[in-house]
Amino acid sequence: MSVASFFSSLPARPFGYKDGRGRTGMVSTTDIGRRMVKPPVLACRPIESNTYHGSVFLTKSSRSPSPSLSPTPTALDDEIVLDLKPFLIIYKSGRIERFLGTTVIPACPEVATKDVVIDPATGVSVRLYLPNVVDLPSKKLPVLVYFHGGGFVIENTGSPNYHNYLTLLAAKAGVLIVSINYRLAPEYPLPASYDDCMAGFNWVVSHSAGPALEPWLAQHGDFSQILLSGDSAGGNVTHYVAMRADAGVIEGVAIVHPYFLGSEPVGNEINDPANIEFHDKLWRLAAPDTEGLDDPLINPVAPGAPILAGLKCKRAVVFVAGNDFLVERGRMYYEALVKSGWGGEAELVQHEGVGHVFHLSDYSGDISVAMMTKLIAFLKGE
């Protein structure tokens, strides 16, 4: 049975929790006190996970799912329909078990962070990071809209890797960060993730002209300096949003280890057919209606894809890692952008001897420090 036909045959059942991540949904919070940022690794304690950590049921219903945990395993839970470890396993019963990207670190005043629901209908929320501005309360800060990675199927704004990394980045770069907590596949197939991220971006931009929805953005956001960034699937989303934004809104984009694929193996993909097969399955799980690996959503340089000259920003930097399975895809994207006739400034930054999103788990290594220094310089326009 194909993945798509399996999904369509499932009976309507509730998800694990409101946002489809096997945990409680985000809630709106009031403005909190701003204090000096603590070291990210000491910021907050992870929320404890339950026994069926990240497990949910698929449903065909478009309504917001009601809270429930996966029930006691049955015989159907022994039959695996799709094994995509280390990300997730889907069982015949419809239960989904995630192994990565489900731990959540709560927002807390000590690091000047908070969560805000931007769409109650979908539960989509953002996590804001405000650096210490006590001495300069009227200072306006560049606004960085960030999209997390995870292959469109795992991770969230509250995961330790992203919370700690973005806390550190906000403190060092002096930028106000808005991290988008988008819905995940397979419960919410693409284009749900794209739609949520586009909605999050538009929500940020709306503060430049409309009523003050979010005090931190209204008081401290410099909307002449809106930047986008994301890693892996978030790098893919960064490209997606920048292609569809209004002209003149985005100052720059930083695309980190982008999750781009293609039907024809390139570079180190040629000698790794197992990895190609894995990512083909993962992409088709996230996008069951896809045209395949040359779908412009996953291969922006495929024949027929929108020309990259349409990227709506002034500056772009593409980061790639030498040991990353996706390294050649990032290079190809950069080269296609430069050759497209796009009028902005582009730069390719490659780090050797490191793999995919290495910087999220190692903040103090020489290469990680060099990468953050480069990213900060880009965000500041230096």
From Swiss-Prot:
Active site, per annotation: 232, 324, 356
Record's subcellular location: Plastid, Chloroplast
GO cellular component entries: chloroplast
Keyword tRNA-binding applies: no
Catalytic activity annotation: 6-tuliposide A = tulipalin A + D-glucose
InterPro entries recorded: AB_hydrolase_3, AB_hydrolase_fold, Carboxylest/Gibb_receptor
A Pfam family per the record: Abhydrolase_3
Organism domain of life: Eukaryota
Thermal activity profile: Optimum temperature is 35-45 degrees Celsius.
Tissue distribution of the protein: Expressed in roots, stems, leaves, petals, stamens and pistils, but not in bulb scales.
Record EC number: 4.2.99.22
Transit peptide region: 1-74
Keywords recorded for this protein, A-Z: Chloroplast, Lyase, Plant defense, Plastid, Transit peptide
Regulation: Inhibited by NaF, AgNO(3), HgCl(2), CuSO(4) and phenylmethylsulfonyl fluoride (PMSF).
A GO term for molecular function: hydrolase activity
Complexes and interactors: Homodimer.
Cited PANTHER family: ARYLACETAMIDE DEACETYLASE (PTHR23024), CARBOXYLESTERASE 2-RELATED (PTHR23024:SF577)
UniProt name for this protein: Tuliposide A-converting enzyme 2, chloroplastic
Source species: Tulipa gesneriana
